[in-house]
Amino acid sequence: MSSVANRRTPALIVLSTGFVVLWLIIAAFPFLWTLWGSFKVQGDFFSRADWMNAIWGTRTVVETGGMFTGAGYEGAWIENQFWRAALNTLVIVFFTVIVSLTFGTLGGYALARSGYRYAFWLLMLALVFRAMPHITLVSGYLLPFFEWKLWGYKTTTVIVLVAINQPFTLWMLHSFFLNIPKDLDESAMVDGCTRFQAFRHVIIPVMWPGVVTTGLFSFLLAYNDFAVTAMLLSQENQTMVPQIAGFLGSTFEEGNVMFAVAAVVSATAPLFVLIVFFQRQIVSGLTAGAVKG
């Protein structure tokens, strides 16, 4: 009976496969189109006369002699030193993730193992702060940062990003710790471990997929941030996202859209690599956080 119920008809297979393929095309098309257009000139990629120019590169052939050109990448990475923004982003993201996970694992473990009612209300308070718009929180830091001459530095930006991200890491890691039986802690301490040693050598290895998943979400928050980095960083310490916005120009300054297109592709590609590399940990981590063990 079960084999009959699990047997899929050819029509169902075709329908499900077609749906998955359609979804993949819709999801991947914006990035693939931007990737293709990043090797064209602006007259082709943003052509109003014929959108097919973006495919055949009519203006690109006229201006550069070939269907493809790397002028956008050269202008962004070399002429405008986008590599400096990439390094700044790497530094800020790295320390934001490390600090967030350090405090998040310790705090989430303490709240999960605490039997007091205040743990719930602390998590609710953290959720309130997490729900607030980032721009609301950042504006409160501007005056003291200017007064204490701390504005423009990467260190202060890391502190603000950690403060904004910490409620999320607390909630997520707290749910992972709740799924780990307290018997593991007690068994480790019976064997001679202190509470911290049990946490470090027993609990963390068990819930490592959850730590990786939370770290990736923290990474994405800091990597994609615009409001905090645009308002708190000086020009020389600027990260990728605000600099991409700068490539688009302003009311008083003309930008170069193709520099922005090339920079967008450069900033997006590492995210695909990261997700593919950690996909197994992400799936197992999300599953562990969703199911009460």
What are these regions (language model features)?
Residues 4-7, 12-293:
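A structural signal for multi-pass alpha-helical bundles of membrane permease subunits
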